[in-house]
Amino acid sequence: LARTREYVDVLRRAFAREEHLRNDGEFWPLPYTGDGSTGLGKPLKVMTHPLRADLPIFLGAEGPKNVTQTCEIADGWLPLYYSPWRPEVYADQIAHRNEGFEIAVNVSLKVTDDVEAALLPVRASLGFYIGGMGAKGQNFHTQLMARMRFESEALHIQDLLLEGRRAEAIAAVPAASPDEITRLGPPHRLRPRPPPPPP
């Protein structure tokens, strides 16, 4: 959290071009004077003149504390997996977002009659992230799926992937999960639809 906060502060100051940039923070020292430096660095001002000094900063955040901080320090949020049918997952985190704060959801869209085939790469990605992108007991994607009420499925997927059973892990991804975060299928299926029943 502190690293991200300092990073955003450095970016905002760089974009503003009001100073030769110096940062004495813990994570992003400018100029760098640590191991391997020549000691000759000096504060610089960004040479480019942005069209506006307040360039919007969007952050990808997933954990509750990260999302809360993103709503405080950034201009927008890039959620990884966001289901419009489960607004409660991030309701507390985004409740006090700044005015004008944007949520930019990345949604896969494909018009096709073969829904299962279209969902397969999404299931594969979910299976890999839920099961293998993190340590057992500390995987932010597994934790997110648990908050989305897929906890037992997420833990099972993680067990399978960590045992090297990737195909089974992908097959274990509940159908509702990839279906809620994408718009895949024939035209009638892409229209707004009621939320699925809870698992």
Regions found by a protein language model. Name each.
Residues L1-P199:
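Active-site-adjacent structural elements that line small-molecule/cofactor binding pockets in enzymes
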